[in-house]
Amino acid sequence: RGDRPMKDSGIEWIGEIPAEWTASKIKYCTEFAPSCNTSHLSEDSLVTFTPMECIKNGYFENREAHFSALSSSYTQYQDGDIVFAKVTPCFENGNIAIMQGLSAGFGFGSSELFVIRPQSINTEFIFYYLQNNIFKQYACATMTGTGGLKRVSPTFVRNYSVFIPSYEEQLEIVQYLDEKCSGIEVLIAKKQQHLTEIESYKKSLIYEYVTGKKEVV
């Protein structure tokens, strides 16, 4: 876009932002911990059920369970909601996903999940926004609790500043990040496959020499 007019965001760790972007907060552009209407579900309805290990790096495993088997102690969400971990180390490890294609359009998950429902912001844009390192660093600084049960402050999440471009630019940014991140994931997968092959070779090498299949010459 070339040189574009910039303005002070008013937040030291963000600095300048494009002049036409508007300042908001998560609690204003999304519903935080929204309610879900389950009146259309029967006890036998199959809904999505996602323990914490089913959610990672933008993906989730769509397990199913009967609606009647799931208690109110679980976190509820519906199609289009974004869920992400509130507890360490799952928060730092990227347990976040957009919940789409849910069984019966509805799901239950760990009680250690935050849920937001985008309103005046593109879902994929805020999804990427929540994965930036600055958000994670400041969120971790708000954690309270002991040992492995430290949790991010919900007040921090609700009041976290979001700077919003036009809807058209949000779509452009999302498309660009989708393409770039997809390419990066392919590279990671290839690297992981290479590491797996090397590890397999290492194990085979050890086995062959300690069992006498080969000898040192």
Residue spans of the language-model regions?
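Periplasmic-binding protein-like
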Residues: 135-138
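Short coil/turn segments at secondary-structure boundaries
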Residues: 6-8, 39-47, 141-143
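Non-catalytic DNA-recognition/assembly elements of restriction-modification systems
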Residues: 5-39, 159, 171, 194
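Amphipathic alpha-helical coiled-coil/heptad-repeat segments
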Residues: 1-4, 161-217
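A short beta-sheet element
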Residues: 73-133, 145-147, 153-154
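Sequence-specific dsDNA recognition surfaces
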Residues: 27-39, 45-82, 98
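Proline-centric
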Residues: 15-23, 113-124, 155-178
